[in-house]
């Protein structure tokens, strides 16, 4: 998705599905070789490729997809393999992880400062600047080569708007190289 000259790629989106009847942990373990881990059961699917987590309430959390349609297909696959009805499946969208590129270098080591719209610190361990974007309610990890990863976003469009906003802020503060 390109907005304002910035191409945003969704890397992952957590999606939770609430079936009419809760999914039984024991059924997933015995019928599909799911793995119990505390109060959850984990099952990796090959087609569609996804990791499915059955939470303590019997809801289905799908991890490892970047499209809601693929996550829904994974949840339906699980239900059908268990012999359960897949109708009435409610969808709840979780956070998005996305990436984009500023297409220029960034002086990340000089980004320990307050900006209108957020705060930035340089993380020496990661080798990037971390922007807590209060305007768009997400976090940006910015590397010196211009590569950026957004986490905690609620929608890809918010990442795109954040990318355009921060590109302008970095230009304004002479931090783009």
Explain the meaning of each model-derived region.
Residues 1-141, 145-147, 153-177:
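Intrinsically disordered, low-complexity polar/charged tails and linkers
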């Amino acid at each position: 998705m390109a907005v304002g000259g910035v191409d945003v790629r969704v890397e992952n989106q957590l999606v939770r599905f609430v079936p009419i009847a809760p999914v039984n942990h024991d059924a997933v373990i015995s019928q599909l070789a799911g793995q119990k881990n505390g109060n959850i059961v984990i099952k990796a699917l090959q087609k569609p490729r996804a990791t499915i987590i059955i939470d303590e309430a019997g809801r289905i959390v799908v991890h490892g997809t970047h499209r809601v349609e693929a996550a829904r297909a994974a949840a339906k696959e699980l239900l059908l393999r268990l012999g359960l009805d897949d109708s009435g499946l409610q969808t709840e969208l979780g956070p998005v992880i996305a990436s984009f590129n500023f297409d220029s270098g960034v002086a990340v080591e000089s980004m320990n400062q307050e900006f209108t719209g957020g705060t930035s610190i340089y993380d020496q361990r990661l080798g990037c600047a971390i922007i807590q974007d209060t305007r768009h309610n997400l976090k940006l990890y910015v590397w010196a080569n211009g590569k950026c990863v957004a986490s905690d976003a609620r929608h890809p469009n918010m990442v795109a708007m954040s990318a355009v906003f921060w590109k302008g802020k970095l230009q304004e503060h002479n931090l783009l190289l």
